[in-house]
């Protein structure tokens, strides 16, 4: 009998952010052994076939800005999800819930005897709050993030209620253990990349005779953009530092002089990320707090060595192999790494080759296959140790 996995994503399925990650996992987990259905408020231009999709909202609400109906959309999606799970109380169906699923829904699933898996797209909120509070304090700013004590407590209760938790980063695992989540609940996992999304040979940027370093993602304090600006300026490397993403207002206000340098370029949202990466020599990502840093996997797939942090390394970047993994506040280490990438082309190329080779094991099809096996093993009563081996062999 084919097992069923019902996925609850309390957000529109748009192919961006967490919905992209969820969709790519669902698409490749679906198969003869495991039937996957994703419950969402609505979809927009993103197919995850052969996985199934259940849209909770009626068609006439599809074009209403989601911020105006998000409370209703989330409630309706969770209600439909619970109705479906109550119909499948034969042990062949599991629930896989994503962040922002309500505690009430998780408890209702447990009361119905349903096994619940939970995704972590970031570290435990308690850990994230500590990291971000300190980051803003260092910059002389008040905390400009949205994590409060109430949300930390709510997430802790959800984590206590679920059966298993997918951890896409070793730092995520550590953060959960620090907050008392039982080790046996933790399932080491990763995110991945899609080679089809990066095929081609076009370049987004014109050639440059110096080193091209790229940063992709929200240009914000959490992702260490201000640190990279400082390290780049102090490295005195000849070349260009290119940021691609939306910018946090305080970064523009407080580090405007560094952003205005002739060797710094800021781009808004980039649709051709492959073209951006093909224009670059190095991927730099001094992120302070992260779950599964998808951009790191994608950069590696495009053959870019990384200079990043333990948070930004994910399961793919190993220190002195696919790049450098450094403490985000290690200014001397970061400056030295940037200088080495500029001066030692042979070592940089060796790291680039290693990154491209290692990325082959993190294509979405392989990532999802490992996840599917973890779910099936749990449903069959396999030991937790067996759930760990496929991924640990890669890192």
Residue spans of the language-model regions?
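Aromatic "clamp/platform" in nucleotide-sugar-dependent glycosyltransferases that forms part
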Residues: 288
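Acceptor-binding helix/loop patch of EC 2.4 sugar-transfer enzymes
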Residues: 61-70, 116-153
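Short hydrophobic beta-strand element within catalytic cores of glycosyltransferases
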Residues: 305-308
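Carbohydrate-associated surface elements
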Residues: 171, 192
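Conserved donor-binding/catalytic core segment of Leloir-type glycosyltransferases
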Residues: 200-223, 229-234, 242
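Nucleotide-activated donor-binding/catalytic signature segment of Leloir-type glycosyltransferases, i.e.
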Residues: 252-270
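Conserved acidic donor-binding segment of nucleotide-sugar-dependent glycosyltransferases
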Residues: 319-320, 324-331, 340-345
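Short alpha-helical donor nucleotide-sugar binding micro-motif in glycosyltransferases
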Residues: 159, 269-270, 276-280
């Amino acid at each position: 009998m084919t097992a069923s996995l019902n996925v609850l994503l309390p957000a529109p399925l748009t192919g961006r952010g967490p919905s992209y990650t969820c969709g790519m996992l669902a698409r490749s987990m679906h198969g003869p052994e495991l039937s996957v259905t994703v419950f969402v408020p609505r979809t927009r231009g993103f197919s995850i076939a052969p996985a199934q999709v259940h849209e909770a909202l009626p068609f006439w609400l599809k074009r209403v800005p989601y911020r105006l109906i998000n409370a209703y959309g989330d409630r309706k999606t969770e209600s439909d999800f619970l109705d479906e799970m109550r119909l499948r109380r034969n042990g062949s169906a599991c629930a896989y819930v994503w962040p922002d699923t309500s505690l009430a829904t998780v408890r209702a699933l447990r009361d119905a005897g349903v096994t619940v898996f939970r995704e972590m797209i970031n570290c435990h909120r308690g850990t994230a709050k500590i990291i971000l509070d300190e980051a803003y304090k260092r910059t002389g700013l008040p905390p400009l993030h949205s994590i409060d004590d109430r949300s930390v407590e709510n997430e802790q209760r959800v984590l206590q209620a679920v059966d298993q938790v997918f951890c896409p980063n070793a730092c995520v695992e550590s953060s959960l253990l620090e907050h008392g989540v039982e080790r046996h609940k933790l399932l080491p996992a990763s995110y991945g990349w899609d080679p089809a999304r990066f095929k081609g040979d076009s370049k987004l940027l014109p050639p440059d005779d110096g080193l091209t370093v790229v940063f992709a993602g929200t240009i914000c304090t959490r992702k260490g953009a201000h640190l990279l600006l400082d390290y780049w300026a102090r490295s005195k490397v000849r070349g260009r530092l290119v940021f691609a993403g939306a910018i946090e207002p305080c970064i523009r206000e407080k580090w405007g002089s560094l952003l205005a340098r002739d060797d710094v370029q800021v781009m808004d949202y980039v649709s051709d990320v492959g073209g951006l990466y093909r224009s670059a020599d190095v991927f730099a990502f001094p992120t302070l707090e992260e779950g599964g840093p998808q951009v790191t996997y994608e950069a590696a797939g495009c053959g870019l060595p990384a200079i990043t942090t333990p948070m930004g390394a994910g399961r793919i970047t190993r220190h002195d192999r696919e790049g450098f993994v450094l403490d985000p506040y290690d200014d001397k280490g970061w400056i030295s790494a940037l200088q080495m990438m500029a001066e030692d082309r042979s070592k940089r190329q060796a790291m680039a080759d290693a990154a491209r080779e290692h990325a082959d094991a993190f294509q979405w099809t392989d990532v999802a296959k490992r996840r599917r096996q973890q779910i099936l093993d749990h449903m069959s009563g396999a030991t937790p140790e067996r759930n760990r081996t496929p991924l640990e062999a890669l890192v």
